[in-house]
């Protein structure tokens, strides 16, 4: 008995000491700032330090006399076991500092191909991060060699091990050629979770410095640095003792930049050796590179790429799937022809030109257009496509949807050729800076049809008149600091495209300025502070696209009557009070955006009716309310005009009352590919969502509303502060003969008296395909009540958001039978003051597989739930849970983890939980 107990105690002590070491390491790595939180973790460590010597003393004393352990000794053994279990829980289930989503953010873009040289450079970079005497690391090499790819891979590798890597925070900032101190500081501040007023802008560096000092150890990655940066001015406190474990990694094309920034280590990213270059080339070309006929030529083509990864990837993808020997020989000849007289940096332009030459003619111009935007700029794809159509690069005869589909296809082909890449947000693209440099070089060096002036994002204060020549076809001066536009520019300019958006200091467009551009097809003045446009604007007879987004002082425009070729008109968030005069004469106009025009009050009757080509009418968030027969305002357009537009595909409008929107408009709704309808008498209401069929009803009595016909087309329904919801739902339950299968999202805000008439319960699931459900201030004790109320089975539900439901005691209980939440992925619950638990499936049969109750639930976020005692009973196993955030839930006693979970809990929850469970 003694030997057995002694061995058990010895094993338990060894395990506990191992866990103690891991916790100490985690505490050291985490960089925890709040002393109270740090003290609570040390509670566990102190108990370990108290009990380990006691256990060792027992073993020492008992080894000399073979007697059984006393009851007191057995208590020590049990205490050691408990401490070991608690420690294991801390290591496995609690992210000691922050969730991985906070410590490291994923940087989008390709990782490098896993080759020996690349992996060695990555290992070398990681080794530098571990060296105590190394704070600043330079990564340098020519453009296109893979510097950004290397540090991006480092960043994303750190994300994989965010909870255990050495830094409290990893910050990624793209600097770019046109360095802007304030912009870089704002990017860092955003990563730190800081927002600033204009008055605080002058203190950005100081505020960043103070926050970084608190972090103790951080990693700052500065990508694409062209000129030395004063880190002290930026707000980076590397010189302080408290930040001695912090690091800065920068990438640059020039070693001189790294040296002037006093880097401790510099890593050169060189071109690939022949063998690895061939491997990367084959990876991108595919099997055709090793075919008998092609391989000898392919070897030579690979050699001509000079080991430069960007060239290898670009050329490789251009030739992918092309087995014709003639194509390969032609490619090789083109590469060799440019080789003798140009250096390596220009060599990449030769390889990129080869990829460019393989493009179809319209794709070439579309590709070059992308270079008009500033470096590292994320271009919205839909806006890019409209530019292309307006300039005549894409067929403008297609319907709007077909036009967008063609444009997206072209974008994807350019991405497949490595000439474009994904932008920083959804549905955006951008150019690699080397590819953009090539495009600008090509446009500035070519003759008729290509000549462009690109000075976007250069910080220009004065208009560069000396750069203008009559042959320039595209001009991009966007995102500068121009203070004024000249009254006179060189005469006879052939410019088709003039992009001036983002010059917020410009207050006026002189009359003579636009006279210099009689052939304009595209004019973009978004974000300038103009109140109107000059009379000469009316002479732009070739204009096809006029973009005046975010011109918040723009009150009116000259008559548009003479702009007979205009196709796209964008006045988003302008201050116009009525639609421009002469609009009714524009028979070619196919796109109007007046969204978020909060002062728009007038659309004269008959104006819209004349726009026979109109396909998109976007008035989301506009103050104008469309009337229907019987409620129209005198002299104002009504919805009946819209129904007469034969080509309309997208419609976003606001109407006063849903009751008058009857089945007679069903034919209109059916032929729309996308719509956003808002019904509200209130002038300023947020527009509905951005899905295919969005319906929002706000501050309306809907007790007599019969909208079943409309819900057949709706994908997203938002009900805000509506009276009579019980009556509307009763109508749906009693009159609906089929489910609303299109509905994917339902949001209800303020429904304090939810109740149906006796016996009025739906026998079918009204929303069988619902994926998102949001409830705010709804009178429910359990979400399960919706089962009987609307027949909602929630079998497709992925996201559930609940807030302010004061009667809610549990989310799901036996009213939702086991197995009906197979797709639920995320739950967010806020300010439900009576909520006691999330799940209670106590009546589920004992032999039922617990793991199948919520098989896909990965994220739970809980906030301000004072009565919440538990998340679930013992029957529920949250096998897939990955992320748990808990804030201000004082009564919560247990957490739903199982072996293998990697619980990512925010630090406030972690410490509150530890202080309760560890005593």
Curated annotation (Swiss-Prot):
Instruction: Tell me the Pfam families matching this sequence.
Output: LRR_14 (PF23598), LRR_RPS2 (PF23247), NB-ARC (PF00931), WH_DRP (PF23559)
Q: Which residues form a coiled coil?
A: 1-30, 74-95
| UniProt-recorded name of the protein | Probable disease resistance protein At4g27220
The Gene Ontology biological process annotation of the record reads: defense response
Q: Where does ATP bind?
A: 141-148
Keyword annotations of the record: ATP-binding, Coiled coil, Leucine-rich repeat, Nucleotide-binding, Plant defense, Repeat
Q: Which parts of the sequence belong to the NB-ARC domain?
A: 121-399
The domain section of the record reads: The LRR repeats probably act as specificity determinant of pathogen recognition.
Signal peptide as annotated in the record: none
């Amino acid at each position: 008995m003694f030997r057995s107990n002694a061995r058990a105690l010895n094993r338990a002590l060894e395990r506990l000491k191992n866990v103690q070491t891991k916790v100490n390491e985690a505490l050291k790595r985490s960089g925890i700032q709040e002393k109270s939180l740090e003290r609570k973790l040390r509670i566990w460590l102190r108990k370990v330090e108290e009990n380990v010597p006691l256990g060792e003393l027992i073993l020492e004393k008992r080894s000399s006399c073979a007697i059984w352990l006393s009851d007191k000794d057995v208590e020590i053994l049990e205490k050691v076991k408990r401490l070991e279990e608690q420690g294991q829980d801390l290591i496995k289930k609690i992210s000691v500092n922050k969730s991985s989503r906070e410590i490291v953010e994923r940087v989008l873009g390709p990782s490098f191909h896993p080759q020996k040289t690349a992996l060695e450079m990555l290992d070398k970079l990681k080794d530098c991060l571990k060296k105590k005497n190394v704070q600043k690391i330079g990564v340098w090499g020519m453009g296109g060699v893979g510097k950004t790819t290397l540090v991006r891979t480092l960043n994303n590798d750190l994300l994989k091990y965010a909870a255990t890597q050495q830094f409290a925070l990893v910050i990624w900032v793209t600097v770019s050629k046109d360095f802007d101190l304030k912009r870089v500081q704002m990017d860092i501040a955003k990563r730190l979770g800081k927002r600033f007023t204009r008055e605080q802008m002058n203190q950005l560096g100081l505020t960043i410095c103070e926050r970084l000092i608190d972090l103790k150890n951080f990693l700052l990655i500065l990508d694409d640095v062209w000129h030395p940066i004063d880190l002290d001015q930026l707000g980076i406190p590397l010189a302080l003792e408290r930040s001695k474990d912090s690091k800065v990694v920068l990438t640059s094309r020039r070693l001189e930049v790294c040296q002037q920034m006093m880097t401790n280590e510099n890593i050169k990213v060189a071109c690939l050796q022949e063998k690895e270059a061939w491997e990367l080339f084959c990876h991108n070309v595919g099997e055709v590179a090793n075919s008998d006929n092609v391989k000898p030529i392919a070897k030579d083509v690979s050699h001509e790429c000079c080991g430069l990864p960007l060239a290898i990837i670009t050329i490789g993808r251009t030739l992918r799937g092309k087995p014709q020997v003639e194509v390969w020989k032609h490619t090789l000849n083109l590469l060799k022809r440019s080789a003798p007289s140009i250096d390596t940096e220009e060599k990449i332009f030769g390889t990129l030109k080869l990829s460019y030459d393989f493009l179809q003619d319209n794709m070439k111009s579309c590709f070059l257009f992308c270079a008009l935007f500033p470096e590292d700029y994320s271009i919205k794809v839909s806006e890019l496509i409209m530019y292309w159509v307006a300039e005549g690069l894409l067929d403008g005869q297609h319907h709007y949807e077909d036009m967008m589909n063609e444009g997206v296809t072209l974008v994807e082909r350019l991405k497949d050729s490595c000439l474009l890449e994904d932008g920083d947000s959804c549905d955006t693209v951008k150019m690699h800076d080397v590819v953009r440099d090539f495009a600008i070089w090509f446009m500035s060096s070519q003759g008729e049809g290509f000549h462009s002036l690109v000075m976007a994002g250069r910080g220009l204060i004065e208009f560069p008149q000396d750069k203008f020549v009559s042959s320039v076809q595209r001009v991009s001066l966007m995102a500068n600091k121009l203070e004024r536009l000249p009254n006179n520019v060189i005469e006879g300019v052939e410019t088709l495209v003039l992009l001036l958006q983002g010059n917020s200091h410009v207050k006026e467009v002189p009359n003579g300025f636009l006279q210099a551009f009689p052939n304009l097809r595209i004019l973009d003045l978004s974000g300038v502070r103009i109140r109107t446009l000059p009379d000469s604007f009316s002479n732009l007879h070739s204009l096809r696209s006029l973009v005046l987004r975010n011109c918040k002082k723009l009150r009116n425009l000259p008559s548009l009557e003479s702009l007979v070729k205009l196709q796209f008109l964008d006045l988003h968030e302008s201050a116009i009070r009525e639609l421009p005069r002469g609009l009714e004469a524009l028979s070619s106009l196919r796109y109007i955006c007046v969204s978020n025009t909060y002062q728009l009050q007038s659309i004269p009757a008959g104006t819209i009716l004349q726009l026979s080509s109109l396909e998109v009418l976007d008035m989301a968030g506009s103050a104008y309310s469309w009337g229907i027969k019987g409620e129209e305002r005198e002299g104002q357009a009504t919805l009946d005009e819209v129904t007469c537009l034969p080509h309309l595909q997208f419609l976003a409008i606001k109407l006063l009352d849903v009751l008058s929107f009857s089945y007679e408009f069903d034919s209109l709704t059916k032929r729309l590919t996308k719509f956003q309808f808002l019904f509200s008498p209130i002038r300023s209401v947020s527009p509905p969502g951005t899905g295919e069929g969005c319906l929002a009803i706000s501050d309306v009595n809907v007790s007599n509303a019969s909208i079943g016909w409309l819900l057949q087309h709706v994908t997203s329904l938002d009900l805000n502060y509506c009276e009579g919801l019980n009556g509307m739902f009763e109508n749906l339950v009693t009159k609906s003969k089929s489910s609303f299968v299109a509905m994917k999202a339902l949001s209800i805000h303020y429904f304090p008296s939810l109740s149906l008439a006796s016996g009025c319960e739906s026998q079918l699931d009204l929303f069988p395909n619902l994926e998102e459900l949001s409830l705010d201030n709804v009178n429910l004790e359990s979400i399960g009540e919706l089962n009987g109320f609307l027949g909602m089975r929630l079998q497709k539900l992925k996201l559930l958001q609940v807030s302010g439901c004061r009667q809610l005691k549990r989310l799901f209980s036996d009213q939702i039978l086991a197995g009906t939440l197979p797709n639920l992925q995320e739950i967010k619950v806020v300010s439900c003051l009576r909520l006691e638990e999330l799940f209670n499936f106590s009546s589920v049969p004992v032999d039922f597989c617990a793991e199948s109750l919520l098989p896909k639930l990965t994220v739970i976020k809980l906030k301000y739930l004072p009565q919440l005692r538990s998340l679930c009973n013992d029957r529920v196993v949250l096998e897939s849970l990955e992320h748990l955030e808990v804030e201000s839930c004082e009564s919560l006693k247990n957490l739903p983890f199982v072996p293998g979970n990697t619980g990512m809990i925010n630090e406030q929850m972690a410490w509150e939980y530890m202080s309760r469970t560890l005593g």
